[in-house]
Amino acid sequence: STLFPYTTLFRSPGEAQVDFGHALIKLNGQLRKVAFFVMALPYSDAVYVQAFERECTETFWEGHVRAFEFFGGVPRRITYDNTKVAVSQILHQGKERRLTRGFLQLKSHYLFKHHFCRVARGNEKGVVEGLVKYVRLNFFVPVPQVPDLEKLNADLEQRCGEELQRQLRGQKGTKAQLLEEDRQA
């Protein structure tokens, strides 16, 4: 038999990953594509999702604010890809970033540390990448039929709350119980 080396992933409390995905909804009977913001806390496996008409600076901010309210606090460190909403320029062969003014304001207001993935290395935030797919398949299938985005977002937030009641395989508590450790970190 062949042995394969592996590394157990260690997930620290108080860390988050952010990404956007896209899905189809029926808004007043019309099929529309929406952007959805996802913030994941890998330690507790807690997730927050909100849908917006598009991905832009305002929805990036609003997604953060709503997620912080839902989680009951601000993660100490958040990992991102190199979204133009946060990064205006990648410098020194990808080792440094020039941040947008809007992102610097968000960061200085909420006082979290940031981390950006290496260019074309989405696997560095693999938890949220996987969750974007999970959310698309489990929250947006079948295609939600809603009168407005407020109703959709209320439904998405309710689903996120329901997810907190689930127990993670190999863990002794629910996601909500592990979220308490995330909050204290």
Each model region followed by its residue ranges:
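Short, solvent-exposed loop/turn segments at secondary-structure junctions
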Residues: 86-90
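Mobile-element integrase/transposase regions
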Residues: 10-47, 55-62, 108
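Short, small-residue-biased leader/transition segments that mark boundaries at the very start
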Residues: 2-9
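RNase H-like two-metal-ion nuclease catalytic core shared by retroviral integrases
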Residues: 80-82, 93-94, 114-136, 152
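Active-site-proximal acidic segments at structured loop/helix or strand boundaries
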Residues: 132-185
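Active-site beta-loop-alpha junctions of metal-dependent nucleic acid enzymes
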Residues: 49-77, 96
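RNase H-like polynucleotidyl transferase catalytic core
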Residues: 102-104, 108-125, 144-146
